[in-house]
Every structure is written in C-alpha cells, then in structure tokens.
Amino acid sequence: SANYKENWTFNTINKTYDTETESEVVTPLKGFDSYRTYNFSTSVGTTVYGMFDFGEDKKIQAIRHVMRPSISYNINPAFDQYYETYEVISADGMTTDQVDYTRFENSLFGSPGKVFSSSVGLSLNNNLEAKIRDKDSTATEAKKVFLLNSLNFSTNYNVAGDSLNWSPVRLSGGTQLLDNKLSVNFGATLDPYALDNNNTKVNTFNIDNGGSLFRLSSA
C-alpha cells in the first residue's frame, strides 16, 4: 500500500542563534504553509500444512503442523527539503555548529521525517495439533489437542542501515495444559550480534565471534 499525506498549517517557526545571549531564538510565523509526505509498504504471506499420520490404532494418531510465513517491506523517504539550518557559534568564536530544524516543528499534525528508512520484516507463526485416541472406548472421533497454540518468530532487516542491520529475533509462544485449565506463555529475544569486552553490541555476528548462532538477550 502507498500512503500520501498533505499537511496544511497557518503556524510555522523560524530559528536563529543569538550570539549575545548565546541562546536559540524561535520566531513564530503566521501564514499558510504546507508539506507533503508519503511512504510505501507491502506484505505477502502463505500457509503451509504438514501432517504426520501414525495410524488410527496408535495412541497419538496424527500430528498437524501449520506454518504461516510472511515477509513485508516498508520504505519511508527522507523529507529533508523541509529542513533548514542555523549556525551556533561558540563563546570564543572558534567553532561553528550547524543545527538542523524544520519550520513545521510545532505543527498540529507533527513534522516531516528527516531520516530515510527501508526495512524488510520476516515472521513465522506455527501451531501444532495432535489427534489422540479418546480414553472413552465408545467414542467414535479422535480427540484434538493443541500441543502448541502458537510459536512465533519475527525479525527485521534494516536495508538503509550501515551496521547492525538485523534486529533481534523475537520469539513468543503459548500452550495449554491440564485439559485447558492452565495456560503457559513464554518469550525470548535472540540477538545475532556479539558483545565486546564492555558488553557493547558490535557489528560482528555472534557465531563469527566464537559463540552460538544467537545470543539470548532476554527471556
């Protein structure tokens, strides 16, 4: 899908730097102004069924595995045409910094983004269901039991990033025990990147640093 927004406002601002007071000066401006933003996203998914049949004479007659993989893509352009700069001069006059701002900062509908982003999302949802021979010998139908109500994995790849492009893999799941009287949920975050000696994430895969494929960062 593609989204386009036209934003109109009658209140904008101008920013300058006062060297005497060494402070930012914000001047409100009245009058019609506008900016436009747009983005694009798309996704596709499917459902895959797997059946393992053990025979009607077995206690567990069959197990069905349902997988729902999906992939998505999002892109948000940088609208830096709506940004300006002002100079901040140090007290000794030796250094000058450029500060970016947009005149739409105080707009009722927010301001246009300045950072380009592009990412691919991956997810996989699973559930496992078993057909079990009923203890009641008079029953004609097998009993259906969920072994796993859900087992989900998701991650993102930052196409626009210059490092640490993969986000951590988020794992979540749940099942029910004791004839659906007890619900059990679990989750974990698995990071593909290694840590340095200061426990700071670095742009090196954990497996290339002598570790496992993923590093458990939370559970």
Task: List PLM regions with ranges.
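Outer-membrane beta-barrel translocator/pore domains, especially the C-terminal barrels
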Residues: S1-A219
